[in-house]
């Protein structure tokens, strides 16, 4: 059978082992060919091919529900659920998503992009099933580091207290998240993977006791305790812990042995109550380069399938913002042992990999545990350290309470560095960094800044380190800088709450924030072609706003435009409007940013165009709003 013929996972039923293994081979081929062409997550999906096939061979997917944690593990799932012919559109505009979306397929039972959610959602579905008197299986597949997240442990704690609720948790244990897993839980699991399973009597122990003379089915309480003690000896240490939490434990199982997986899943389906299946997999399985470099091949831009090397750009690109950040922080930390770099399982993505290599004693990776990272930083700050919490904007929102309760209320000098702020492109709505301005701006004591380019980012890193009077946050985008000259040292801190005028004009005020400062300058050039001269301000800070600069300009010019790469509700434009209103400066203001809508996966350029945020589009709208008599049909 060819993989393209599978439009429903139930078609796996009845296939021979040889056929299933051939399907596994085809999945890997399609997966590799597609990611090599489009880019995307490579290693996670390659590691769960056999797991997916074996599990789906034992389920009725017209009834049963499978939830995939994180979502980027689920590419084989997509290929087995009718999306083969669309798989080439993965992560492309109007194509299939790189994560799970309920609206994309009836087999995507719960949307996933962030980690550690599957057990909670699965338990909710299981409880709803029982309340309605229905009968179907619920399976939550967690792994790729997600078990280090506190939410997953909270769900395990809850499920373990529900002995009559049938739910299966499968741990895809590949010893990795994006980077290698860290922490005691990971170390504990690794010990189990490396030891020989001693389950030789666990599965059949009860039957053996029933056959004993005199006891039979009426075991005394004393013998029951003996039986339970022997069970604990007969499973690996982690199994004993899981069983103490209320789950029946199976494993560890070879995650690339289809017959063993099928047999284990069939046995696990017979268990009444919560069951935990521990599956040991290899991230990147079947592709030599991905197995050797599991961090580098977690996700890839388009690459040469034969060599594993990225397809070179047609022209050299400036360094990425994250690389500039990591380099600058490392240089500063070399001379200041108080600086502690903190990440949540994202060393490479946030640019802290070089920091980790050079200054391991000043580096902390907490795993997928953003809440812990923030409060940990608070404790470090209390003792005079300079903690730098480096987390993607979309993931920092998971620690909102800790930012308020543990940092801002106590006014602790923690430096938050929010990578991937703004439009992120192909990762789609679960990963867009749209909301950080709004969710941080409302918190007392917080200072928020954004650089216009990579050189200003260097100065803001110094500013954040030097700011000791309270918490401070810096947002910066995914991707490459503008190519401006960088300094190796001697960076100067910026004055808090002060912007700068980049261009002077007498007709309109353009207030740019962060990445949109460069766009503001481009808009000003277009307006100038129409005889309109704009003053362009690099705001630098959204909190505190530079009202000493903005107010006189707004009063004199009488027309204000704000530009930001974030949500309009509660964002930079809202801050400007509020400040002008409070000061009774009642001038017309037009805001440009992301409206109240989700931004789907596409290239950043496509998203900007869809949102009307390209320089020509903005110039056209400014002309229409303020200078209709000068508007032309074709701008830019």
UniProtKB/Swiss-Prot annotation:
Keywords: Isoprene biosynthesis, Magnesium, Metal-binding, Thiamine biosynthesis, Thiamine pyrophosphate, Transferase. The keyword Magnesium applies. InterPro entries: Dxylulose-5-P_synthase (IPR005477), THDP-binding (IPR029061), Transketo_C/PFOR_II (IPR009014), Transketolase-like_Pyr-bd (IPR005475), Transketolase_BS (IPR020826), Transketolase_C (IPR033248), Transketolase_CS (IPR049557). The keyword Magnesium applies. Its cofactor is Mg(2+); thiamine diphosphate. Pathway: Metabolic intermediate biosynthesis; 1-deoxy-D-xylulose 5-phosphate biosynthesis; 1-deoxy-D-xylulose 5-phosphate from D-glyceraldehyde 3-phosphate and pyruvate: step 1/1. GO terms for cellular component: cytosol. Mg(2+) binds at residues 144, 174. GO terms for molecular function: 1-deoxy-D-xylulose-5-phosphate synthase activity; magnesium ion binding; thiamine pyrophosphate binding. It catalyses: D-glyceraldehyde 3-phosphate + pyruvate + H(+) = 1-deoxy-D-xylulose 5-phosphate + CO2. Its EC number is 2.2.1.7. Catalyzes the acyloin condensation reaction between C atoms 2 and 3 of pyruvate and glyceraldehyde 3-phosphate to yield 1-deoxy-D-xylulose-5-phosphate (DXP). Belongs to the transketolase family. DXPS subfamily. This is 1-deoxy-D-xylulose-5-phosphate synthase. It comes from Microcystis aeruginosa (strain NIES-843 / IAM M-2473).
């Amino acid at each position: 059978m060819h993989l393209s013929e599978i439009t429903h996972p139930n078609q796996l039923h009845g296939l021979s082992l040889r056929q299933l293994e051939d399907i596994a081979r085809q999945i890997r081929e399609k997966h590799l060919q597609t990611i090599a062409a489009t880019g995307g997550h490579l290693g996670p999906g390659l590691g769960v091919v056999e797991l997916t096939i074996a599990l789906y061979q034992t389920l009725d997917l017209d009834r049963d529900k499978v939830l995939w944690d994180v979502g980027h593990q689920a590419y084989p799932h997509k290929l087995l659920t009718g999306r083969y012919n669309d798989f080439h559109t993965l992560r492309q505009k109007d194509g299939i998503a790189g994560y799970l979306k309920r609206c994309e397929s009836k087999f995507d039972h719960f949307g996933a992009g962030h980690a550690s959610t599957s057990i909670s959602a699965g338990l909710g579905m299981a409880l709803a099933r029982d309340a309605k008197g229905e009968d179907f299986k619920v399976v939550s597949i967690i792994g790729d580091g997600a078990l280090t997240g506190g939410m997953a442990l909270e769900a395990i704690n809850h499920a373990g207290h529900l002995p009559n609720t049938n739910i299966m948790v499968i741990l895809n244990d590949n010893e990795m998240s994006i980077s290698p897993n860290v922490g005691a839980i990971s170390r504990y699991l690794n010990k189990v993977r490396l030891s020989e399973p001693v389950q030789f009597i666990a599965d059949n122990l009860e039957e053996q006791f029933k056959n004993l003379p005199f006891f039979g089915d009426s075991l005394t309480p004393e013998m029951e305790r003996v039986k339970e003690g022997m069970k604990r000896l007969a499973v690996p240490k982690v199994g004993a812990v899981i069983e103490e939490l209320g789950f029946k434990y199976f494993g560890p199982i070879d995650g690339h042995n289809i017959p063993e997986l099928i047999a284990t899943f069939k046995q696990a389906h017979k268990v009444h109550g919560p069951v935990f299946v521990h599956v040991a997999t290899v991230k990147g399985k079947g592709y030599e380069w991905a197995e050797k470099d599991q961090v580098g091949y977690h996700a890839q831009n388009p690459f040469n399938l034969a060599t594993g090397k990225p397809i070179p750009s047609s022209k050299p690109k400036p360094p990425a913002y994250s690389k500039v950040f990591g380099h600058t922080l490392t240089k500063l930390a070399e001379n200041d042992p108080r600086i502690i770099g903190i990440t949540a399982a994202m060393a490479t993505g946030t640019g802290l990999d070089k920091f980790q290599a050079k200054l391991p004693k000043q580096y902390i990776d907490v795993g997928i545990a953003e809440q812990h990272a923030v409060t940990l930083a608070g404790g470090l700050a209390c003792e005079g350290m300079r903690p730098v919490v480096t987390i993607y904007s979309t993931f920092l929102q998971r620690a909102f309470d800790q930012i308020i309760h543990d940092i801002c209320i106590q006014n602790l000098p923690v430096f938050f560095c929010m990578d991937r702020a703004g439009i992120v492109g192909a990762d789609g709505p679960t990963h867009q960094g749209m909301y950080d301005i709004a969710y941080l701006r409302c918190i007392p004591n917080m200072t928020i800044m954004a650089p216009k380019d990579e050189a200003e980012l260097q100065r803001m890193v110094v500013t954040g380190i030097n700011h000791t009077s309270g918490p401070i946050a810096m947002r910066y985008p995914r991707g490459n800088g503008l190519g401006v000259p960088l300094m190796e040292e001697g960076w100067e801190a910026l004055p808090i709450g002060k912007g700068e005028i980049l261009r002077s004009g007498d007709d309109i005020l353009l207030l740019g924030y962060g990445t949109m400062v460069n766009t503001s300058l481009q808009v000003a050039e277009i307006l100038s072609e129409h005889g309109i001269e704009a003053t362009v301000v690099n705001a630098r800070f959204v909190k505190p706003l530079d009202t000493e600069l903005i107010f006189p300009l707004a009063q004199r010019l009488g027309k204000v435009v704000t530009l930001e790469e974030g949500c309009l509700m509660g964002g930079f434009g809202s801050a400007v409007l509020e400040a002008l209103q409070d000061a009774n400066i009642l001038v017309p203001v037009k805001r440009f940013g992301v409206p109240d809508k989700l931004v789907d996966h596409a290239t950043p350029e496509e998203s900007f165009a869809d949102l009307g945020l390209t320089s020509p589009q903005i110039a056209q709208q400014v002309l229409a709003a303020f200078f209709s008599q000068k508007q032309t049909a074709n701008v830019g």
